[in-house]
Amino acid sequence: MAKKMPDIGEYKYGFHDKDVSIFRSERGLTKEIVEEISRMKEEPQWMLDFRLKSLEHFYNMPMPQWGGDLNSLNFDEITYYVKPSERSERSWDEVPEEIKQTFDKLGIPEAEQKYLAGVSAQYESEVVYHNMKEDLEAQGIVFKDTDSALKENEDIFREHWAKVIPPTDNKFAALNSAVWSGGSFIYVPKGVKVETPLQAYFRINSENMGQFERTLIIVDEEASVHYVEGCTAPVYTTNSLHSAVVEIIVKKGGYCRYTTIQNWANNVYNLVTKRTVCEENATMEWIDGNIGSKLTMKYPACILKGEGARGMTLSIALAGKGQHQDAGAKMIHLAPNTSSTIVSKSISKQGGKVTYRGIVHFGRKAEGARSNIECDTLIMDNKSTSDTIPYNEILNDNISLEHEAKVSKVSEEQLFYLMSRGISEEEATEMIVMGFIEPFTKELPMEYAVEMNRLIKFEMEGSIG
């Protein structure tokens, strides 16, 4: 018997709690609000100057004229800063009760106890809970919310801040630079390998809320780390904005994997800038899952600056009714013998739209560089659409570039075979979809793979007929 298609109100993470914030800025973006954010955070003068300069860039830069439809995004209707509690806690018991109940519903304390080396939980504009295992601290690993790192690790913080993504990069990077709050700061010392993942969880609770976390990760020579972030928000009738910036520096021989499982509600604009600089023989892997949001525009980038540097992006995007996933990757080869891989898996259903948008650049010094791109799309019905928009720029003849794109529908032969074995059409379709995304889920830690499969199954309910 076919399952009932879930109503939007049944979205598991769509609950919202009463407002328990201790401060909320006026709606709209002004110099006074930026100054107020900086004053409340007791920031050094250089950070206030950085914010105000970024605000000027934001005002002066045009909106993107490509990608998704941003016409319904009204910057004057957004609340840019909501402070949910007095401070970030290291004991779960000390987190304010209403906020703790939200994260309890999302399974955060349980996840930490089971398999995480460290956890950070951000609610609205601030990190409300942060903890890391003591043995990692003893190795010199720094894992803090970004605001604390600015105060406690200012020298290394300032050395790398906004060096990978300056405020002039794009309008939303400028916006983030002006009003950023929260996020994660990670430093892994030379030769130290973090064996279990560090996680951050980002939650929007308020209506018309903007969340602008800023994450900075520095992986020193021959060090390694795996960082995982998850995102959810309540279902509202008005729009919210998530506009993060993620900067990563991977030094000689270092390794970083950054895993995202984004499950924002369908009223959230998810407009994110993520970029890594990889030095000699460094490796960066983006594992990027996009299930929710009204519109996602996200293209994780690797600047392969050192000889032998490697970059990989493995992404999945699922778009249903009223959704547009405009996602992809950028690989910038600047040195000899660099290599990159892009694997993009997209599913569109019930009139959803998926777009792969990618750039691969081979600079003049990229002798012997190589890149492989695979784009696979599964279209579930005649109402849904898919576009593939690759852009390749080649300034060196001695390179290798392979690009394969494939668009398919659920095969009648596959369905017939499975249904002839007593499997319902809905279950058969679900099995085909699970097989399609398996290259992505097998790269996730086990607990995340289970959750990802559950999310996909939930999204696929009601897709038949």
Curated annotation (Swiss-Prot):
One of its GO terms (biological process) is iron-sulfur cluster assembly. Disulfide bonds: none annotated. InterPro entries: Fe-S_cluster_assembly_SufBD, SUF_FeS_clus_asmbl_SufB, SUF_FeS_clus_asmbl_SufBD_core, SUF_FeS_clus_asmbl_SufBD_sf, SufBD_N. It holds the Pfam family SufBD_N. Belongs to the iron-sulfur cluster assembly SufBD family. The SufBCD complex acts synergistically with SufE to stimulate the cysteine desulfurase activity of SufS. The SufBCD complex contributes to the assembly or repair of oxygen-labile iron-sulfur clusters under oxidative stress. May facilitate iron uptake from extracellular iron chelators under iron limitation. Part of the SufBCD complex that contains SufB, SufC and SufD. This is Iron-sulfur cluster assembly protein SufB. It comes from Bacillus subtilis (strain 168).
